[in-house]
Amino acid sequence: LFPDVTYSFYDVWADLYRIPYECQKLDEDFKLVKEDYYKENGGVIFPNPNAPTGIYEDLSVVEDIIAHNQDVIVIVDEAYIDFAGRSALELIDKYDNLIVVQTFSKARSMAGMRIGYAISNPTLIKYLNDAKYSFNSYTMNQTSIVCGVEAVKDREYFENGVRKIVETREWAKEELTKLGFTYLDSGSNFIFAKHPEYDAKELFEALKA
């Protein structure tokens, strides 16, 4: 199970590996309907904050979904969590079925290094490593490893960068409001906005010109 409006590669990978899936509709505010994830399923994945909406779900909602799916794996994709609120990492020791995935591509601005990682209990990590080693034992090059290590060391630079991005996001919201836009309350580094008089294609073409 995963949301119908979400990261575009969930269904791509599911189709590639012939994994059947079911998309769950978001509510009218583009938020998860947690009860839709109570049904029997083979696994759950969802991003928090979501992309492309930017919506951040409170940790209580995340935990509720995990708690109702303890017989299957629940993956919380936290690519944008550094711009939002509390992480599901604090639930790792409480739920054996939880995997939290994060990346250096967003808040650390290192998309080109292709650094991503999963955090879970030792048993699930072992299973992930078994699967990884059967496909590609060396998923990161030396340059990425060195850059990743140095990025982790410089916590001050990272925190300052996140702070500036969040400040810019809030400034952008104010400016969009002045221009007549409405938008969702973003917990990411982007804003999902619309204008009552112009559709997305018109705006795109005008900006492109």
Description of each model-found segment:
Residues 1-13, 20:
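Conserved PLP-anchoring active-site segment centered on the Schiff-base-forming lysine
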Residues 166, 178-207:
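Conserved PLP-binding catalytic core of the aspartate aminotransferase-like
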Residues 7, 48-52, 106, 189:
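Short glycine-rich anion-binding loops that position phosphate/pyrophosphate groups of nucleotides
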Residues 3-4, 23-27, 102:
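Short beta->alpha connector loops at strand-helix junctions that form conserved
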Residues 17-18, 94-95, 179:
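Short, structured coil segments at secondary-structure junctions
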Residues 22, 27-82:
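Active-site phosphate-binding strand-loop segment of PLP-dependent enzymes
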Residues 97-177, 181-184:
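PLP-dependent aminotransferase class I/II
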